[in-house]
Amino acid sequence: MFNRMTSLWMGDLDPYMDENFIKQAFSTMGETAFGVKIITHRVTGGSAGYCFVEMADEASVDRCVQRLNGKLVPGSNPPRKFKLNYATYGKRPEPGPEFSVFVGDLTSEVDDYQLHQFFLKKFPSCKGAKVVTDPYGNSRGYGFVKFSDENEQKKALEEFQNASGLGGKPIRISIAVNKGNKASTYHNQNNTYNTNYQQQYYRQPYNSYYPQWGYDQYSGYNYGYNPYAAPPPMMGPPPPMGMPPMPPDMQGSTEAHDGTEEVEEDPSEDPNPQVDVEELNRQYMERSEELYDSLMECHWLPMDTITSDISMMNGS
């Protein structure tokens, strides 16, 4: 009998992924799976595409969710990424205000777990962290950290700027900026923020910043079935028991399993992009030269006065 408090939900399984394969995958990643229960389809008897994995304790569950999510499953062909969640709804993070920061200049070895632990040691309200990855699971060099306490978010902006100890080089940090609100003003240096910006920012759903975090990555699953009952054909497997229903516009969608998984581009961006001044100057000069050449090649002659007759020109 599985203990849900010490178990993981794992999705996006291919038919060949049996208990031994999953145990070996966790072992390769440095974790020990004590048991695997693959959920089967009630009619066909085949895999329903998800399973439950029992770990040693709750700390191991937390670590796996943070450290392995989004990484490639060892030995998977076609390549698959770990899609993990808590096996019990009670482990879902509590609702409430969330305040995020952008963290840049992350070296390739930094993962979600390391990023979270780096901030958690100093700021107890740190609720989680996400390193943004490409479709192959490689780090893009930046991520996001969220807090439940706004004061600790502001302290992190001050105290962790150019901080060392996470990866191979100092990190840079700023308030998280969503592309939809890029025009909103803020002043990071003296921690004064535009009031309208804050009101808009704190109401934004966090799936804009963390498309692979928490339960949103499984939002397409149908919630009307018991987790141990097989879903109907063309439906994805359900999430852990007790998950509340999603809005109508998010129900009925399914995830791709064609081997070339389409990954939605993260809508967040680096708030301090590097500007190539030489390239911008070169483009400006090219546009200026094109305008000059167009004027020089024009065959119209200037008029003496506004009432002058326009002379006819014979083409050469």
UniProtKB/Swiss-Prot annotation:
It comes from Danio rerio. GO terms for biological process: mRNA splice site recognition; translation. InterPro entries: Nucleotide-bd_a/b_plait_sf, RBD_domain_sf, RRM_dom, SECp43_RRM2, TSAP1, TSAP1_C. This is tRNA selenocysteine 1-associated protein 1-like. Coiled coil: none annotated. The lineage of its organism: Eukaryota, Metazoa, Chordata, Craniata, Vertebrata. PROSITE patterns: RRM. Involved in the early steps of selenocysteine biosynthesis and tRNA(Sec) charging to the later steps resulting in the cotranslational incorporation of selenocysteine into selenoproteins. SMART domains: RRM.
